[in-house]
UniProtKB/Swiss-Prot annotation:
The keyword Ion transport does not apply. Catalyzes the acyloin condensation reaction between C atoms 2 and 3 of pyruvate and glyceraldehyde 3-phosphate to yield 1-deoxy-D-xylulose-5-phosphate (DXP). The gene is dxs. It comes from Thermotoga maritima (strain ATCC 43589 / DSM 3109 / JCM 10099 / NBRC 100826 / MSB8). The lineage of its organism: Bacteria, Thermotogati, Thermotogota, Thermotogae, Thermotogales. Its EC number is 2.2.1.7. This is 1-deoxy-D-xylulose-5-phosphate synthase.
Length: 608
C-alpha cells in the first residue's frame, strides 16, 4: 500500500510521486469527469499528513469528500482509481461502504468538525488513544454547521487538529467576512516575508531539525499583523500558519509539532486550486467539477435558468436571484453578469439563503432561490417556518432533481417532492421539457404570490437559447393528456415523461406538470375512463407524487387499481444516468415490462 511506502521516501521521491499523482488524477478526471481542481490542490497536503498521521489508527475526516482523491490512491485504491465515478466503480466522494479508512462519509459541506467531535468523544469513552484530524476547505468553513461545531471545541475539551485547506474558493470564489479574514491572513506582507525566511532556514537544516523558533516567528508576526486575537483564537483554539500547502517538508514538520498537543489546533494551509494543470489554475471554478472530455457542447437546464431569469428581469425589476456558493453550477452567473445588483451569492449557507429570500419576498421583491435539490434539504426548517408559514412569495429553482449520475447518493435529488409535498402553501412544478421549463418560469414569475418550487434535472439537451426565449409565454400549469389508450393510464411528472412516451403499449399518457396541487379535473377524467392507473416519478416512491395521487383517488371513491413507480427504499449509487434508470426499472424498457405485467394481471382479473 502506498500509505506505507511514502513514509520511507525521501523528499525528492515524494515530489516525484506528487507529480505522478497529479498526472494520474488529471488523466482520469478528464476522462471520467469529477472534481479536478480541488484534488490537484491537496496532493502535497495529503502526502505530508499521511507521513505523520495514519488513517488506520487515526480518524482523518475529509470535509465534503471531493478533495480526497489522493487519499483514495494512498489507501489501497490506486488500482481501481481509473473506475472513479463510473457505474460499479469507486465513488467520487468519501464513503464508509468503500473503505474502513474512509472514517466518515461525506458529500455535503461543513460536516467534518461535528463528526470529528463525535469520534473524539467515542474514543474517550471507550478508552482508545487515537488522534482526530479534520481537513476542511473549499469554502466549507463558512457553512453554519462548521461554525457551530467550531464553537463547541472548547466546550468539549477537544484536542482535534483542524487542517484548513485555504484555496480561496468553494465551487465559486468564497464570499463573506470569514473569507475576507482568511484572505488578510494569507496575503499579509509579514506572512509572505516570513514564508521566505522560513524557506531559507529549512534549506540549511537537516531533516530532523526542530523549527520551533521559526514557527514562533511566524506565529508572533501574524499576531502582530492582526493586532489582536484572530477569529480562531477568539474561540479558544490555537492557530498556526498560514503555511505553503505545497511544501511537503514544511507541512510534515508542522504536523509533527501539533500531533500531540493537548488542545485544539487550527493549521492554516494555503493551496492553489488546480495546481499543476494550467487550465484549472486559471479557471478553478470551471474545473471544480470537470465533465468528461470529448462530449459535444449542449445546453443545460441550469444555463437555461440563468438566461430565462436574465431576460425576464429586464422588464421586471423586482426579480432577484440568490445562490449558495454555486453561481456557475446553478447558471446564475449568467444573471449576475446582466443584473449584478440583483444577484446574491451568500456562500455555503442554504438556511440563510432561504430566510433572506423570504424577507425579500415579503417586502415586494420576487426572489428566486436557486439551490441543488440535495442541498436544499439543509434548509427544510426555513422552508416551512420562514417561507411557507408566512406564505412568502419565493420561487425555489431546484436544480439537479432526480438521478444526477456520477456524483452518487449524496447528490441525487430524489427527496424534494417527498419533503415539499406536506408543506402548506407550497406549489410544486415539475416540467418535462426545456420549453415547458422556460414557460413555467415565466408564468410563475408573472403571478408569484406564495412559495413555488420548480424542480428540474441535471440533463443537457440540444437547443437554441434565443429560440426558446423568443417563444416564451404564459401557460396553463395544469395536466395534459398527451395520448389516449385503452389498457391503462400512466401519469408521469418531470422529464421521466420522455421515457414513458417510448412505451409501445395502448395506454393513456398524462403529463402532470404540477405535482401540487393535483389537477383534479384531469384526474377525475382519467379515473372515469380507466380501471388501472400507474404513476411514474423520478423520486422516492414512499410519500411521493404517486402516494399523493393514490390518496386523492381513494378520497374520490375510485375502485380501480393504482400502481406507483419510482425509486424504491434505497440509496441510489453513482453511475451514468442511463445505467441508473435501467437499474431502477425507470427507463423505457423497464417501464414497458412493468406496465405490461400489471396490464396482464388486470386482464386475468377481468378488469381491463
Amino acid at each position: 500500500m502506498l500509505l506505507d511506502e511514502i513514509k520511507r521516501m525521501s523528499y525528492d521521491e515524494l515530489k516525484r510521486l506528487a507529480e505522478d499523482i497529479r498526472k494520474r488524477i488529471t488523466e482520469v478526471v478528464l476522462k471520467n469527469g469529477g472534481h479536478l481542481a480541488s484534488n490537484l490542490g491537496t496532493i502535497e497536503l495529503t502526502l505530508a499528513l499521511y507521513r505523520v498521521f495514519d488513517p488506520r489508527e487515526d480518524a482523518i475526516i475529509w470535509d465534503t469528500g471531493h478533495q480526497a482523491y489522493t487519499h483514495k490512491i494512498l489507501t489501497g485504491r490506486d488500482d481501481l482509481f481509473h473506475t472513479i465515478r463510473t457505474f460499479g466503480g469507486l465513488s467520487g466522494f468519501v464513503t464508509r461502504r468503500e473503505s474502513p479508512l474512509d472514517w466518515f462519509g461525506t458529500g455535503h459541506a461543513g460536516t467534518s468538525i461535528a463528526a470529528g467531535l463525535g469520534f473524539e468523544k467515542a474514543f474517550e469513552l471507550l478508552g482508545e488513544k487515537r488522534h482526530v484530524v479534520v481537513v476542511i476547505g473549499d469554502g466549507a468553513l463558512t457553512s453554519g454547521m462548521a461554525l457551530e461545531a467550531l464553537n463547541q471545541l472548547k466546550n468539549l475539551n477537544s484536542k482535534m487538529k483542524i487542517i484548513l485547506n485555504d484555496n480561496g474558493m468553494s465551487i465559486s470564489p468564497n464570499v463573506g467576512g470569514l473569507a475576507y479574514h482568511l484572505s488578510k491572513l494569507r496575503t499579509s506582507p509579514i506572512y509572505l516575508k516570513g514564508k521566505k525566511v522560513l524557506k531559507k532556514v529549512l534549506e540549511k537544516t537537516e531533516i530532523g531539525f526542530e523549527v520551533e523558533e521559526e514557527m514562533k516567528y511566524l506565529r508572533d508576526s501574524l499576531k502582530g499583523m492582526i493586532q489582536g486575537t484572530n477569529f480562531f483564537e477568539s474561540l479558544g483554539l490555537k492557530y498556526f500558519g498560514p503555511f505553503d500547502g505545497h511544501n511537503i517538508e514544511l507541512l510534515e514538520k508542522v504536523f509533527k509539532r501539533i500531533r500531540d498537543y493537548d488542545y485544539s489546533s487550527v493549521v492554516h494551509v494555503v493551496t492553489k486550486k488546480g495546481k499543476g494543470f494550467t487550465a484549472a489554475e486559471e479557471n478553478p471554478t470551471k474545473y471544480h467539477s470537470a465533465s468528461p472530455s470529448g462530449k459535444p457542447k449542449m445546453l443545460s437546464y441550469s444555463e437555461l435558468l440563468g438566461h430565462t431569469l436574465s431576460r425576464v428581469a429586464r422588464e421586471d425589476k423586482k426579480i432577484v436571484a440568490i445562490t449558495a456558493a454555486m453561481a456557475d453550477g446553478t447558471g446564475l452567473s449568467i444573471f449576475q453578469k446582466e443584473h449584478p445588483d440583483r444577484f446574491f451569492d451568500l456562500g455555503i449557507t442554504e438556511q440563510t439563503c432561504v430566510t433572506f429570500g423570504a424577507a425579500l419576498g415579503l417586502h415586494g421583491m420576487k426572489p428566486v432561490v436557486a439551490i441543488y435539490s440535495t442541498f436544499l434539504q439543509r434548509a427544510y426548517d426555513q422552508i416551512i417556518h420562514d417561507v411557507a408559514l408566512q406564505n412568502a412569495p419565493v420561487l425555489f429553482a431546484i436544480d439537479r432533481s432526480g438521478v444526477v449520475g456520477e456524483d452518487g447518493p449524496t447528490h441525487h435529488g430524489l427527496f424534494d417532492i417527498n419533503y415539499l409535498l406536506p408543506v402548506p402553501n407550497m406549489k410544486i412544478i415539475s416540467p418535462s421539457s426545456p420549453e415547458e421549463f422556460v414557460n413555467s418560469l415565466y408564468t410563475v414569475l408573472k403571478h408569484l404570490d406564495g412559495p413555488v418550487a420548480i424542480r428540474y434535472p441535471k440533463e443537457s439537451f440540444y437547443g437554441e437559447v434565443e429560440s426558446l426565449l423568443e417563444n416564451m409565454k404564459e401557460i396553463d400549469l395544469g395536466w395534459k393528456i398527451l395520448k389516449r389508450g385503452r389498457e391503462a393510464a400512466i401519469i408521469a411528472t418531470g422529464t421521466i415523461l420522455n421515457e414513458v412516451l417510448k412505451i409501445p403499449l395502448d395506454v393513456t399518457v398524462v403529463n402532470a406538470l404540477t405535482v401540487k396541487p393535483l389537477d383534479t379535473a384531469v384526474l377525475k377524467e382519467i379515473a372515469r375512463d380507466h380501471d388501472l392507473i400507474i404513476t411514474v416519478e423520478e423520486a422516492m416512491k414512499i410519500g411521493g407524487f404517486g402516494s399523493f395521487v393514490a390518496q386523492r383517488l381513494q378520497e374520490m371513491g375510485w375502485q380501480g387499481k393504482i400502481v406507483n413507480l419510482g425509486v424504491e427504499d434505497l440509496f441510489v449509487p453513482h453511475g451514468g444516468r442511463k445505467e441508473l434508470l435501467s437499474m431502477l426499472g425507470l427507463d423505457s424498457e423497464g417501464l414497458t415490462k412493468t406496465v405490461l405485467t400489471y396490464i396482464k394481471a388486470r386482464s386475468r382479473e377481468g378488469k381491463v
